[in-house]
């Protein structure tokens, strides 16, 4: 029970960080807040037995760190995606549901690498949160699931607040 509660605390801290990231004014600031989220969320997933999720998040830390440092290349991104798919498939114990974090991360990796448009990235965050919602409900990470819904809603607010910038980028 203590590990479960600790996992929920880590999940809540991560959720706060990702919510802040959705209001970031630059791609780099968004990525840094997401790295912070990923660290806490990976620990929470490990404590809850969500190994595919923890792996996916760990690779996302590497991806975002390389992007912040401007060291990401198409080759490195491709290698990270392939590793994620292969190792994620190996660790998957949840059938189709276990692939949702992988799908989420691959789609975000491609989006973050191909567009500087924050509004588009916010839409991809919504897609990701909905996939994570299903995964979190499956591993019974209910507070994380509530967080997924909250992040979806806060990101929608950020999209509405910044809708003028969407057409300009």
Q: What residue spans do the PLM features occupy?
A:
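Alpha-helical membrane-protein topology signature
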Residues: 1-169
